[in-house]
């Protein structure tokens, strides 16, 4: 039966225990039956079967005569599991069970419909391949008939059926033989006939065959004869005509498709491709067959055929170049590479490439016209030319973009040109002149390469066993490495190499681990599973090369690269890529990603395992995601991360360096060898923006997770800090502050005049940091050294908390970087601001605003703000719940701290009790002559005053308020209130000393007596 049902399942009767794959509310709603094609029997629980577990039953009866066991849920629609009629307490679970029973009934109704006679999509009744029982005999012409009626009809006509069938077969043979010039005469062996020519054939009714006569003519055949009784069947007597018909069929245009081959396929396939077996190449690995494979490749190319061989082990040696112009299928083959082997398959597209130099008419036409500016999508010099239409272009230009390893790297771009100069990729940078174009014509059909297994047991010294050159529109699949040594000495093996390729996909290559190659001095040298240069629009999928080694690398001039579902120790791009680099659904090893870029990088659902215990702590770069330091350390584009998971720890690196890795790093190793000249159109960003949406760290880390979220651990100062950083849904799961270390970055491009920023509100923001829905112990901003300290950060923190430790360890913000800091809905412990210390760039004015959320300072103060010559701007808090060592009965450090450094509005204060309080700032007896005081209050705060008023024998405690003005000079701030019980006016006054944007209260005076001053937020 169709098993696409949720409440009915049938199993073959191959055992005595069977699973119940659906949920059910009661065992009485489960039915177990034995079923055959003609009968069904419902079994009884306990006597016929029993429950082994809630989801499994065991039969207790024989299944002889039955082919299937059916388990079906049949929930009662009248016998409700939950009864709401008795007036008892209604619980949520009751509603859930009742709803579930209704859902079960609905599912069973749908399954009953799907397994019953129903109307199909084309208006017919569908019996699902089952018998229809208990059908009445048909009456009208349009009624269904029963088997009984049909048997009677058959009995009436059965004697005529053989003749009808025989006539049909005879007619078919007459047509087939007629096509080859043979005539089927009237009559048969059974009725008698006469054959007069070699082109006549006689029909045998009983044998259902036709025969020609090879003996003496004429040949008279009497009635009731057979071929055997009238001369026999032989080459000189009766000849079966089917052999002649077969010859004609094989000679026809489709004849080759009708003959199979032992190794699979047909003769027609063999005409389309050839095999190594066609050349009798030894395939047990006992003989060197290098030359034989060369011969096969040459013949295949000459005849325009594919190569297909799916078994065998082939021993090869030397340095052969086996050219392949068409498809290659070596899946199942093992190439056993001899020691020192350096040969390769050259998978290429013959006559596909044309190179145009600077003096060629086509390049001169481009340079003489427009369209070479940044962002252009049309080369105007080609609008009226068709020469490059429909080609992939690899273009080079005259302008230096950057220096890497001391070498000037010139302008380039890879793209596809459709027609009239239209490019598929707009120019990232403009260029003064094009100097070279390599044009590759796309294939008119897709070719397929299925790669062999490569046996490295003999220690080959190859540099690219599979090389793809000047090629487009191909699909490369499979391939693997076996017997790879753990270490290669003085060898740099590269497995797959691609150059000047476009619009292709390569997938399912398995390298058990990347090669770890060293020179004779045991120093690391390159060795790659995959290497490519000058490619465009490439997809690498399900590549495996995980372990201690280099992994995969992109060389120069590569555009639009995607890695998907891969397992790699590292993704590397030597020269910067253009367009995009995408790493999707991939697992990376400790070295992560090293790639400078002139485009955008995308990481989605990537896991990075930092464990370097077997790596000795060696890292080329500090970060998990890095812009390559030996190529300038820049990344002129964005970094976009979704759902990044970090596991393992780089403990060996941390032990050697004294700090953990960074999340992102960008810096030059040596600015004299790797940098961007001022004339270059490249902007030296260390990623222009970094957007992280989802960072997951499932294992707790002691200390900070990253040395810096964005890092430039260098004194080269060659790249800019990202203009924008956004962190959302990130759980750092660490026990110490995370950090933005702003040291090592170039002076921001948004303050090129190096204006000293004394007030964050008086200068435009230079960098933006947004942190939302994140969990961390704290966040620290460490400012640059003085010569580079010209940044003004705009920082927004929304719903940032430490969810791992809950409210026991809320989030802390630490900074000495001038900026605007806005916190919304955070679980805050403390704001620490050292940006106005008396050292470098002293007395700068940062701003802080806190809106909503909880500010739990635990046992300490809510702020720790150090200033040099007066603190100008308080923290503005609106609608915040303050929790900490606040008191309404005694003056505490937390009381004084919040009043001095926080301008509070609409806030509440809690201490250990459940009642809101007003923090006490002063207590005493401030009467008409005044009482001295010494506490600071941020301007704009409202103070509450407790006044004890007396009028004769009548006394009253009066609560009054006094707002500290935003603008004032040293002097009194006064107010008047009225005592209704004492029936008189009460005057009060605080003596204030101006201290920038806060006031020092030095005197408390009242016409009666002020007994307490509180912060009234």
Swiss-Prot record:
- Location(s) in or outside the cell: Virion
Q: What is its main location?
A: virion
List the keywords (alphabetical).
Degradation of host capsule during virus entry, Degradation of host cell envelope components during virus entry, Host-virus interaction, Viral attachment to host adhesion receptor, Viral attachment to host cell, Viral tail protein, Virion, Virus entry into host cell
Tell me which Gene Ontology terms the entry assigns under biological process. adhesion receptor-mediated virion attachment to host cell; symbiont entry into host cell via disruption of host cell envelope; symbiont entry into host cell via disruption of host cell glycocalyx
Q: Which domain of life is it from?
A: Viruses
Ribosomal protein is among the record's keywords: no
What cellular component terms from Gene Ontology apply here?
Answer: outer membrane; virus tail
Q: InterPro entries, alphabetically?
A: Coiled_stalk_dom, Phage_T7_tail_fibre-like_N, Serralysin-like_metalloprot_C, Tail_spike_N
What's this chain's function? Functions as a receptor binding protein (RBP) and probably mediates the attachment to the host capsular exopolysaccharides. Displays a depolymerase activity that specifically degrades the KL64-type polysaccharides of Klebsiella pneumoniae capsule, which allows the phage to reach the host cell membrane and bind the entry receptor.
Subunit details for this protein?
Homotrimer.
Record's domain comment?
Answer: The N-terminus anchors the RBP to the virion. The central part and C-terminus probably binds and degrades the host exopolysaccharides.
Q: Under what name is this protein listed?
A: Depolymerase, capsule KL64-specific
Source organism per entry reads Klebsiella phage P510 (Bacteriophage P510)
């Amino acid at each position: 039966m169709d098993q696409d049902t949720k409440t009915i399942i049938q199993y073959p009767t191959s055992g005595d225990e069977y699973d119940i794959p659906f949920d059910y509310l009661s065992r009485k709603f489960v039915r177990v039956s034995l079923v055959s094609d003609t009968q069904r029997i419902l079994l009884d629980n306990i006597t016929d079967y029993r429950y082994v577990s809630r989801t499994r039953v065991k039969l207790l009866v024989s299944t002889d005569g039955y082919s299937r066991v059916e388990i079906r849920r049949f929930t009662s629609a009248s016998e409700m599991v939950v009864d709401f009629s008795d007036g008892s307490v209604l619980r949520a679970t009751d509603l859930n069970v009742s709803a579930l029973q209704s859902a079960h009934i609905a599912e069973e109704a749908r399954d009953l419909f799907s397994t019953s006679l129903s109307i199909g999509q084309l208006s017919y009744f569908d019996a699902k391949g089952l018998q229809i029982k208990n059908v009445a005999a048909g009456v009208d012409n349009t009624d269904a008939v029963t088997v009984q009626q049909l048997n009677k009809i058959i009995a009436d006509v059965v004697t005529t059926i053989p003749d009808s069938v025989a006539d049909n077969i005879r007619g078919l043979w007459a047509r087939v033989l007629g096509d080859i010039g043979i005539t089927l005469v009237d009559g048969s062996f059974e009725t008698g006939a006469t054959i007069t020519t070699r082109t006549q054939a006689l029909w045998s009714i009983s044998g259902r065959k036709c025969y020609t006569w090879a003996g003496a003519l004429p040949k008279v055949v009497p009635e009731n004869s057979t071929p055997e009784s009238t001369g026999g069947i032989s080459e000189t007597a009766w000849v079966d005509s089917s052999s002649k018909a077969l010859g004609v069929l094989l000679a026809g245009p489709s004849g080759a498709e009708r003959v199979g081959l032992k190794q699979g396929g047909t003769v027609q396939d063999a005409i389309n491709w050839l095999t190594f077996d066609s050349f009798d190449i030894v395939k047990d690995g006992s003989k060197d067959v290098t030359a034989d494979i060369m011969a096969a490749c040459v013949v295949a190319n000459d005849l325009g055929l594919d190569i297909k061989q799916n078994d065998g082990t082939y021993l090869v040696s030397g340095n052969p170049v086996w050219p392949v112009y068409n498809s290659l299928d070596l899946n199942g083959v093992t190439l056993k590479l001899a020691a020192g082997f350096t040969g390769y398959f050259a998978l290429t597209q013959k006559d596909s490439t044309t190179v145009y130099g600077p003096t060629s008419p086509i390049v001169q036409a481009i340079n003489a016209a427009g369209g070479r500016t940044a962002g252009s999508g049309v080369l105007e010099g080609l609008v009226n030319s068709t020469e490059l239409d429909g080609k992939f272009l690899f273009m080079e230009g005259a302008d230096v973009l950057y220096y890497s390893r001391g070498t000037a790297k010139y302008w380039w771009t890879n793209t596809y040109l459709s027609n009239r100069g239209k490019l598929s990729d707009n120019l990232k940078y403009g260029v003064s002149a094009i100097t070279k174009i390599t044009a590759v014509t796309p294939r008119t059909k897709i070719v397929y390469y299925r790669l062999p297994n490569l046996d490295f047991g003999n220690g080959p010294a190859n540099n690219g066993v599979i090389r793809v050159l000047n090629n487009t529109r191909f699909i490369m699949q499979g391939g693997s490495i076996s017997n790879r040594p753990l270490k290669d000495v003085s060898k740099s093996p590269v497995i797959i190499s691609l150059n000047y390729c476009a619009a292709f996909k390569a997938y399912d290559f398995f390298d058990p681990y990347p090669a770890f190659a060293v020179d004779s001095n045991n120093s690391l040298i390159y060795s790659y599973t995959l290497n490519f240069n000058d490619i465009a629009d490439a997809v690498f999928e399900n590549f495996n090369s995980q372990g201690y080694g280099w992994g995969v690398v992109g060389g120069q001039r590569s555009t639009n690269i995607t890695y998907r579902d891969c397992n790699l120790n590292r993704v590397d791009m030597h020269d910067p890529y253009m367009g995009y680099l995408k790493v999707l659904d991939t697992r990376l090893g400790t070295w992560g990603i090293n790639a400078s870029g002139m485009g955008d990088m995308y990481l989605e659902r990537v896991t990075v395992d930092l464990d370097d215990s077997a790596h000795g702590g060696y890292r080329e770069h500090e970060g998990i995601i890095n812009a390559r330091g030996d190529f300038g350390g820049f990344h002129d584009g964005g970094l976009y991360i979704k759902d990044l998971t970090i596991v393992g720890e780089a403990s060996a690196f941390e032990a050697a360096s004294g700090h953990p890795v960074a999340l992102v790093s960008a810096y030059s190793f040596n600015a004299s060898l790797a940098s961007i000249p001022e004339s270059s159109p490249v902007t030296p960003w260390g990623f222009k923006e970094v957007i992280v949406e989802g960072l997951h760290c499932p294992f707790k880390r002691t200390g900070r997770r990253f040395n810096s979220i964005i890092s430039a651990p260098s004194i080269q100062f060659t790249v800019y800090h990202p203009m924008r950083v956004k962190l959302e849904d990130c759980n750092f799961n660490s026990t110490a502050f995370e950090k933005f270390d702003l040291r090592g970055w170039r002076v921001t491009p948004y303050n090129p005049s190096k204006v000293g920023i004394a007030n964050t509100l008086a200068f435009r923001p230079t960098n933006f940091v947004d942190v939302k829905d994140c969990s961390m112990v704290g966040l620290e901003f460490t400012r640059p050294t003085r010569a580079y300290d010209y940044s003004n950060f705009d920082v927004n923190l929304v719903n940032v908390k430490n969810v791992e430790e809950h409210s026991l360890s809320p989030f802390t913000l630490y900074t000495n970087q001038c900026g605007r800091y806005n916190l919304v809905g955070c679980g805050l412990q403390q704001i620490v601001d050292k940006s106005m210390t008396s050292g470098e760039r002293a007395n700068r004015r940062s701003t802080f605003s806190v809106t909503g959320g909880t500010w739990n300072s635990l046992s300490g103060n809510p702020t720790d703000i150090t200033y040099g010559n007066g603190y100008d701007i308080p923290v503005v808090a609106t609608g915040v719940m303050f929790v900490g060592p606040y008191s309404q009965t005694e003056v505490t450090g937390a009381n004084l701290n919040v009043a001095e450094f926080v301008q509070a509005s609409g806030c509440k204060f809690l201490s250990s009790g459940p009642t809101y309080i007003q923090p006490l700032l002063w207590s005493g007896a401030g009467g008409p002559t005044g009482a001295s005081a010494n506490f600071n209050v941020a301007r704009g705060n409202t103070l509450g005053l407790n006044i004890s008023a007396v009028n004769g024998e009548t006394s009253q405690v009066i609560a009054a308020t006094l707002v500290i003005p935003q603008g004032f000079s040293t002097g009194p701030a006064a107010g008047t209130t009225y005592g209704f019980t004492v029936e008189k006016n009460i005057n009060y006054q605080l003596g204030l000393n101006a201290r920038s944007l806060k006031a020092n209260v030095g005197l408390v005076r009242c016409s009666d007596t002020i007994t307490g001053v509180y912060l009234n937020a």
